[in-house]
A protein has these predicted regions:
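Extracytosolic ligand-binding ectodomains
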Residues: 2-4, 8-15, 20-208
Length: 208
């Protein structure tokens, strides 16, 4: 019971998780939408911990393309209407460059047109190649690092690897966008994602 309460508080606090905001480097925001409450909450926490790890590692290494990353995590509870609201909230924030979500078919289907209409790149977790991946086959170093960012040294779940790889693909897209266009925008990142393939922990990933 106490663990559940702590997790709920962490999810609420994670609505806006800023990584490295004390840096003088400009910040770009990555949206993460997942079910942090309800019957699919384990998916949400698996995603949150993995995304948090990936963003921390990128920022600790100096960021990407002259930017630090900030993770904006929103709960859609696996509910289509909440997914629609979360997508709209992220879409109107000009600082949000891309979104990783929504992990479940119906919320993703509902949210996708909102991102498209506003030019927000979406990496749709839950669709190939970002389907559940056996965490027992992930490198031990990743599993240890994942446990270290959780409140109770928890074990990585089936969406840990795919989420980590999605952030890794975004890192590459940000770098390519800056290199090819001299700027990091929704449009330049979308174009870069369309060209990229990235070898991650779970295999080759790309924008489906």
């Amino acid at each position: 019971m106490w663990n559940a309460v702590v997790k709920t508080l962490l999810a609420m606090m994670a609505a806006i998780v800023a990584m490295g905001c004390a840096s003088v480097d400009p910040v770009v925001k990555i949206g993460l939408v997942a079910p942090f409450e309800g019957r699919d909450r384990e998916i949400g926490y698996d995603a949150l911990y993995s995304a948090r790890l990936a963003v921390r590692e990128i920022n600790a290494a100096g960021g990407v393309a002259g930017h630090q990353l900030s993770l904006v995590a929103l709960d859609d509870r696996g509910d289509p209407e909440m997914a629609r609201q979360a997508a709209a909230s992220l879409a109107i924030d000009p600082g949000v460059i891309a979104v990783v979500g929504h992990y479940l078919p119906e919320p993703t289907t509902v949210a996708e047109p909102i991102y498209e209409e506003n030019g927000v790149p979406l990496i749709p977790l839950g669709r190939p190649p970002y389907t559940p991946f056996d965490p027992n086959t992930l490198p031990a170093a990743f599993s240890d690092a994942y446990a270290a960012v959780t409140p109770f040294d928890e074990i990585a779940g089936p969406f840990a690897g795919p989420t980590y790889d999605a952030i890794g693909l975004l890192r590459e897209a940000l770098a390519e966008a800056e290199e090819t266009t001299g700027s990091v925008t929704r449009t330049s990142v979308q174009e870069a994602l369309g060209r990229l393939k990235y070898e991650g922990l779970t295999g080759e990933v790309y924008l489906p």
